[in-house]
Amino acid sequence: MKGEIYVIFNYANNKPYVGQTIKGYLRRFSKHKEAAKRGSNLALHRAIRKYGEEKFWVDLLETITAETEDELLTKLNQKEIYWIKALNSKREGYNMTSGGQGLLRPTPETRKKIS
């Protein structure tokens, strides 16, 4: 299994956003732009509307691999936390949290309970 940690950078004001995805970072960037067009109120999406899509670029920070989905999600969350801190993107960018909440999936125990 594979996931990615990416950064979206606004070169109009030098503010970053760090995220994680299992669908590919370019596809995820497109989804952020679509959400901005739909009027999403997230800070990054408001900024895309304010400055225009052409002021933003995306880059891959890391590719993460794992044997299981749970292991991948744990690694992605850990790396997202690391990069948000390293790039100071919570305080000086568009991240609203310290990271590690993305791609939440029910645990195997929860899946059993709800099935």
Predicted regions and their residues:
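Structure-specific nucleic-acid interaction/processing domains
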Residues: 1-113
